[in-house]
Design a protein with these regions (language model features):
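N-terminal catalytic or cofactor-binding beta/alpha core of small enzyme domains
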Residues: 1-209
Length: 209
């Protein structure tokens, strides 16, 4: 079923996001709206904002989707970042995703991807430390940076980078291989724990609590 496939949603992303929020006592913004309706991680005007299922819908209906589902989510995230920045704090934003192990017949050679903008020193440094910490906590994991996607591509983190100074906003997209998520069990539980422990270590070294 299309809705249950990787084209409909990111399996495990919500579970991972909740685990991170719990561990760091951080605010959590989530949505359970399928990207088959409207993709909350795409900019207005992006050709993939709407899927093939909704792209041909009347303009009035598409506008309603944006107002009911897209804008409230984006506004809430941006408001939290603005509040943090206005207090003189650095906001580290972890956007939780997962990726299909195989796309268009090609295997994705990673268990975890850490996406960031290579021109943002704070993001590159945090991801380097996170990756290094994961090598200690879970050396069996294949961890790659800016894979399977480029961190500077269209997305919510890219939008927020344009809105806030680089020293104040650090936007990272965490990508987890759905092969581990869908296998469930101990490996998926262990992966969540390793990601949290490694991020805590990386954040401390980065000067963040």
């Amino acid at each position: 079923m299309l809705l249950d496939s990787h084209r409909g949603y990111d399996p495990g992303a919500l579970v991972m996001a909740r685990a991170l929020a719990r561990a760091f006592r951080a605010p959590l913004v989530t949505s359970t709206i399928s990207r088959l309706l409207v993709d909350l991680n795409r900019s207005i005007g992006h050709p993939q904002l709407f899927s093939a299922a909704t792209r041909g819908a009347p303009a009035r209906l598409r506008a309603k989707m944006v107002e009911q589902h897209y804008r409230p989510y984006r506004v809430q995230v941006e408001r939290l970042v603005r509040q943090s920045v206005s207090r003189g704090q650095r906001m580290i934003h972890i956007s939780s995703h997962s990726f299909t192990p195989e796309l268009d017949g090609k295997l994705r050679c990673a268990d975890v991807g850490l996406l960031y903008h290579p021109g943002r020193h704070e993001e590159a440094e945090l991801c380097a430390r996170w990756k290094a910490s994961l090598a200690v906590f879970a050396p069996q994991l294949r961890v790659r940076r800016n894979y399977p996607y480029a961190g500077k591509g269209d997305g919510l983190t890219s939008h927020l980078r344009r809105r806030f100074p680089r020293g104040a906003y650090v936007g990272i997209e965490l990508e987890v291989n759905q092969r581990i998520v869908l296998a469930a069990g101990r490996r998926w539980t262990a992966l969540r724990g390793a990601l949290i422990d490694a991020l805590r270590t990386a954040g401390a070294a980065h000067g963040d609590p």
